[in-house]
Amino acid sequence: ALPIEENIKNTQEVVAYAHAHGVSVEGEIGSIGGAEEGVVVEKDAAMYTKPEDALHYVNETHVDALAVSIGTTHGQFKSKAKINYELLKELKAKLGPVGLVLHGGTGVSDEDMKRCVREGMKKINVGTELNKNYIEVVSKTFTADDVTPLTSLRNLLGPANERIKEIVIDKASLFKL
C-alpha cells in the first residue's frame, strides 16, 4: 500500500479525469490483506481502516466510494471473516454519503453480508468465490470423456457461466433487505 499522502495525490488525478468524463471512482486506503493476483499481504490490527484517515482521504480526493478494511482479507475462502461492526458504524457515521465497499467478501457469511448491507455497505466483492467456482466447473467440463478438439467453446464454458450467474443472483438477493 502507498503512503496515504501519495495515495491521495494519485487518486486526486484519477478523480479529476474520471469525474470530468462522468465516471465514478472507488478508492482504497491502507491494505486489506490476504492474497490477490499472487501477492500475499499479512493481516494484522494495523491494517484496519482508521476512521480519521478515511475521512481525510475522502475529503481530499472526493471519491464516490471507499474500500474499507473491517476484518476481511483478499482471497479468503477457507475461513470465516470476523467483521468489526463497531468500526463499520464509525466509518459510516464519519463518511456519510460515500459508498462503503468491502473487499474480500468471499469469506463473509450470508448473515454477516446482510448485516454489512444493513449497516451501510454498498458493494461487496466476492471475486475469489467466483474464480474458484468458475475454475472448478471448467476443470470438470474440459476433462469430460466426450470432449474432442471439435467441441464448441460455448459447450465447454457455458456451464461455468451458468454457475457464476447462479452465484451472482444469490449474492444480489442478500442486498434486498
Predicted regions and their residues:
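C-terminal alpha-helical cap/extension of soluble enzyme domains
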Residues: 109-177
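Glycine-rich beta-to-alpha transition loops that act as phosphate-gripper elements at the mouths
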Residues: 100-108
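Generic hydrophobic/packing signal
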Residues: 63, 103, 156-157
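Alpha/beta enzyme core
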Residues: 1-98, 110, 114-119, 139-140, ...
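An acidic- and aromatic-residue-enriched active-site/binding cleft used to recognize and process polar
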Residues: 30, 105, 129
